[in-house]
Amino acid sequence: MAEVYHALGSRITVVETMGRIIPGADADITRPLHKRIAARYDEVLLKTRVTGATVTENGIEVGFETGVEIRTATFDRVLVATGRRLSGDRLGAQAAGITPDARGFIPVDAQMRTTQPHIFAVGDVVGQPMLAHKAAHEGKVAAEVIAGEKAAFDPLAIPSVAYTDPEIAWAGLTETDAKAKGIAYEKGVFPWAASGRR
C-alpha cells in the first residue's frame, strides 16, 4: 500500500519489526526494492516496533523503539499492515466435527480434505500463503479429488509475489530455506537492469 500512496503523492515512512523488508523472501531479491524505496520514502525503519499512537491536534503521534533509541514522529495518517487475522474459528466448523487449529486455520491434508473426509476446505482458511492464486489451485485439487482423480497440493509450487516497484516474486524454497535444510540447489540470477519493467 505504501507504493500506491507514494504514487499518489504521499510522503511515506515504513516501520518493519524484522531486519529487512519482506522477510519471507531472500535478501538478494529484496535489496533492490529496499534501495529504491529508501531513496523515495522519508524513512524505512528496520528492527523497529511501534510503541503507541496518540491523536493530537497536529496529527497522529507515533512512538518507535529500535532497541537503541526511542522516539516519536507525527503523521497525518497511519496505515497498519501487519498481516491478516483469520476468522476460521468463527465459521462454525465444530458443528461439522472440524476443529480449527490454535491459529484458527482449518487443518487439511494434501488433497484438501479436512478431518471429516467428505468435507474439503481451500483458501485463506487453510493457511499460508493467503493468496488468491493459491486458493484457486487448492480448489482445483479438491475438485479433482472429489471427481476421483489423483491430485495433491504442494505449497512450494505456488509463487509468492509482492506488488511493489520493482515487483518481486519467488516460488519454491528460498535460498535461505534450502541452505538451512541442507538441500542442494542451483541459483539463477537475472539482473534488474535487464527487466523491461524497471
Predicted regions and their residues:
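Glycine-rich phosphate/pyrophosphate-binding beta-alpha loops
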Residues: 124-131, 164, 192-197
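Hydrophobic/aromatic beta-strand patches that form the interior of the parallel beta-sheet core
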Residues: 13-15, 45, 79, 120-122, ...
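Conserved beta-strand termini and adjacent loop/short-helix elements that scaffold enzyme active sites
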Residues: 47-49, 103, 188-190
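Structured beta-strand/loop patches that form or line metal/cofactor-binding pockets in enzymes
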Residues: 54, 169-198
